[in-house]
Amino acid sequence: HYIYAFDNVAFPYGEKSEEFIVERVVEIVTAVQQRYPLALAVIACNTASTVSLPALREKFAFPVVGVVPAIKPAARLTANGIVGLLATRGTVKRPYTRELIDRFANECRIEMLGSAELVELAEAKLHGEPVPLEELRRILRPW
């Protein structure tokens, strides 16, 4: 059995403080855990994962895994030594992301673009809403 919890109240997390994100994610996982017996929690958000995993792992006895930017495989697979990272501004600026780059991609040129708007457009697309191509072009123009 799987339970999917989405925080549509505080979404997106990319512009929120680390303290807010940790408190919010711990609060949500606690609420779910009180209603359902959890064997594992997956934090399926780069921003939330990069800041909340230590607190979650300390609080809960079940395993907690997260998703983080795929720097390691991207660095291994790039043909030209350039890796692009599209993420929230929070993920782009967090020390955890820099540590991934230093550890796994120090020979690569990493081009990062942080945008809350991309998150909102991706979620809109998942809900079947149209995503204007011109809007994507505007957001990606700095790249």
Task: Give the positions of each predicted feature.
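Non-catalytic structural scaffold of enzyme domains
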Residues: H1-W143
